[in-house]
């Protein structure tokens, strides 16, 4: 079996791991895939700014300073730098490293490139038709992205979706496969028993459904723990903060390596999402710990949760029906939740799928 030489990248503007308090799932996935392929004997170069720390054979920074470090912050916080300019700077930092990847690939140093911000790499991939480029799509495919992907389409560019639902806005892209995000099962150990609280974990934003989770807790008189990076603004001030009390508690940001303690003892994790989420790691993390999920029927939810076996899917997205599901959550066998993740959403299964797809197309 050929051992491929691979270059991969997520972002050039901040380091891997991300800054403290930052949740950025694509980075976790990229690191897991890279480290897993190295363990299988592949050569993987991970591109990122100085300070990037990943257990791969080589980190390539090409002298680039991270924008979340003092030297980089001086650029983004300089005179006449507004939000639009900051985004341009981010893009150029990414493109600097992407250009380096293509230069090395042209020299024959890589068999393929695996890039996680596809829109920033498209022009270079389009102009280098002999270099195989794989993109993992982490975000929804918005109409403007569909247009751009079409503009720069070429046979050497392959898209990896993280759910079948993610493909719906752009079914005709050159998809290599759907590969579900995997999690480290050792980091999310199983608990057969639970305490008496519901759980919400994620960004504290409207699309994640925090306000709906709060209302479910009030409707059912259940205790709710809320975990996520602190936010400010009208949404928090009007829809969340007024309801915080001894039963509805905001815990704050919890590092990913400590989340299992909260998942394990929850009676259920609430996921009343308000958007077509391509893949929800909260779903798999919760079930790995044995905790069933109660979720609205949006995005990838029906691909991840088995309705009636590993949780409940609220098909018409009604709060009352979610509240009713809370009352029957003990019908779910927690061991079934764990088994489902072991069989379908482990890191090892994800790594094996990437290896399979890369070898099938490039070899």
Predicted segments, located by residue:
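A short, well-ordered alpha-helix in the C-terminal region of glycosyltransferases
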Residues: 321, 328-356, 360
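Short hydrophobic beta-strand element within catalytic cores of glycosyltransferases
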Residues: 292-295, 305
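Donor nucleotide-sugar binding/catalytic pocket of nucleotide-sugar-dependent glycosyltransferases
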Residues: 132-144, 149-189
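Acidic donor-binding loop of glycosyltransferase active sites
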Residues: 264-278, 291
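N-terminal strand-loop element at the rim of the active site
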Residues: 13, 39-88
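Conserved donor-binding/catalytic core segment of Leloir-type glycosyltransferases
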Residues: 160, 173-227
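Nucleotide-activated donor-binding/catalytic signature segment of Leloir-type glycosyltransferases, i.e.
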Residues: 228, 237-257
């Amino acid at each position: 079996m050929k051992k491929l030489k691979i270059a991969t990248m997520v972002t050039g503007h901040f380091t891997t791991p991300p800054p403290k308090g930052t949740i950025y799932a694509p980075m976790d996935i990229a690191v897991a895939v890279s480290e897993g392929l190295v363990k299988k004997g592949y050569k993987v170069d991970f591109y990122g700014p100085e300070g990037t720390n990943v257990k791969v054979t080589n980190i390539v920074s090409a002298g680039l300073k991270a924008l979340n470090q003092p030297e980089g912050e001086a650029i983004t916080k300089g005179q006449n730098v507004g939000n639009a300019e900051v985004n341009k700077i981010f893009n150029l930092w990414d493109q600097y490293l992407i250009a380096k990847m293509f230069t090395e690939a042209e020299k024959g140093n890589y068999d393929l490139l695996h890039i996680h911000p596809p829109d920033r790499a498209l022009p270079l991939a389009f102009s280098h038709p002999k270099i195989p480029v794989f993109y993992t799509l982490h975000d929804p495919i918005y109409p403007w992205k569909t247009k751009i992907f079409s503009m720069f389409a070429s046979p050497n560019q392959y898209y990896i979706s993280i759910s079948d639902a993610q493909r719906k806005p752009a079914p005709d892209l050159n998809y290599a496969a759907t590969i579900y995000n995997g999690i480290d099962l050792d980091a999310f150990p199983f608990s057969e028993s639970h305490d008496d609280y519901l759980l919400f974990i994620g960004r504290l934003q409207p699309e994640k459904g925090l306000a709906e989770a709060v209302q479910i807790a009030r409707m059912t008189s259940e205790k709710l723990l809320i975990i996520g990076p602190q936010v400010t603004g009208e949404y928090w001030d009007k829809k969340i903060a007024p309801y915080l009390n001894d039963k509805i508690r905001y815990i704050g940001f919890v590092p990913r390596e400590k989340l299992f303690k909260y998942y394990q003892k929850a009676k259920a994790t609430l996921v009343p999402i308000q958007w077509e989420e391509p893949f929800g790691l909260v779903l798999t993390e919760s079930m790995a710990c044995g905790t069933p999920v109660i979720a609205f029927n949006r995005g990838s939810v029906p691909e991840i949760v088995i309705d009636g076996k590993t949780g409940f899917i609220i098909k018409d997205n009604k709060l009352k029906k979610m509240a009713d599901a809370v009352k029957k959550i003990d019908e779910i066998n927690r061991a079934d939740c764990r088994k489902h993740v072991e069989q379908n959403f482990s890191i090892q299964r994800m790594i094996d799928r990437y290896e399979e797809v890369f070898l099938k197309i490039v070899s």
